[in-house]
């Protein structure tokens, strides 16, 4: 039976960047990894209402640099930068090194997989009909230029006794094409009937020229063999 690989993991280094870019010795690696996990946990908890897309962590020379991708940068920064300064102090305390926080704005939240999944989950928690929430997300993404989108929800939909999965797709979502830029994200809605899982795949187009042309080695053509002339 065929199984689905994680769409982001299989594309790392091809069309997808890493969410953490640092190198460490074997002695420091576990501490850094644990620090990353705690920093992400802290920021996700503090920025619940800030439409958080992703968190990128870098560790240049005895410090930590965190880039927060959000659709609402004003909520993260706060009045006169008070909130971002509080976040910086919190991250520095967790990591144990000086911290720097950068804010990157997500221009089109309707085309960001994580934001779409979180939006559907919050609507389900507000008792919006799941089909309406799914259809609205699909229509908004296609209207803003997505090549394709698939949304799946699973659980006790509509308070049903038996859990089931339902999905809605429009356009193309080529999971086997490695050069396809597919934004995959998951979220969960905590309703009175239980937890409903949300999965979103957004196909934004193919990334051509991923490998530089200079690195591509062309096979050498065989030289035509010269015919020997017979001596008279």
UniProtKB/Swiss-Prot annotation:
It comes from the Bacteria. Residues 39-107 form the KH type-2 domain. Keywords: Ribonucleoprotein, Ribosomal protein, RNA-binding, rRNA-binding. GO terms for molecular function: mRNA binding; rRNA binding; structural constituent of ribosome. The keyword Metal-binding does not apply. GO terms for biological process: translation. GO terms for cellular component: cytosolic small ribosomal subunit. Belongs to the universal ribosomal protein uS3 family. Part of the 30S ribosomal subunit. Forms a tight complex with proteins S10 and S14. Binds the lower part of the 30S subunit head. Binds mRNA in the 70S ribosome, positioning it for translation. This is Small ribosomal subunit protein uS3. It comes from Aliivibrio fischeri (strain ATCC 700601 / ES114) (Vibrio fischeri). The gene is rpsC.
């Amino acid at each position: 039976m065929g199984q689905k690989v994680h769409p982001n993991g299989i594309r790392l280094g091809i069309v997808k960047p890493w969410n953490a870019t640092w190198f460490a010795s074997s002695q420091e690696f576990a501490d850094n990894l644990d620090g990353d996990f705690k920093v992400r946990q802290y920021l996700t908890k503090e920025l619940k209402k800030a439409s958080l897309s992703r968190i990128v962590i870098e560790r240049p020379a005895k410090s930590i640099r965190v880039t927060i991708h959000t659709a609402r940068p004003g909520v993260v920064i706060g009045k006169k930068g008070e909130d971002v300064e509080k976040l910086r102090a919190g991250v520095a305390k967790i990591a144990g090194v000086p911290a720097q926080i950068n804010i990157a704005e997500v221009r089109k939240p309707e085309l960001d997989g994580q934001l779409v999944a979180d939006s559907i989950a919050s609507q389900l928690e507000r008792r919006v009909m799941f089909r309406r929430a799914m259809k609205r997300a699909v229509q908004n993404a296609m209207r803003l230029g997505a090549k394709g989108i698939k949304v799946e929800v699973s659980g006790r939909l509509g308070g049903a006794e038996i859990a089931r999965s339902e999905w809605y797709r429009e356009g193309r979502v080529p999971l086997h094409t490695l050069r396809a830029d597919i934004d995959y994200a998951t979220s969960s809605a905590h309703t009175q009937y239980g937890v409903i899982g949300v999965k979103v795949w957004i196909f934004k187009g193919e990334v051509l020229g991923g490998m530089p042309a200079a690195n591509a080695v062309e096979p050498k053509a065989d030289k035509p063999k010269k015919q020997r002339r017979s001596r008279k």
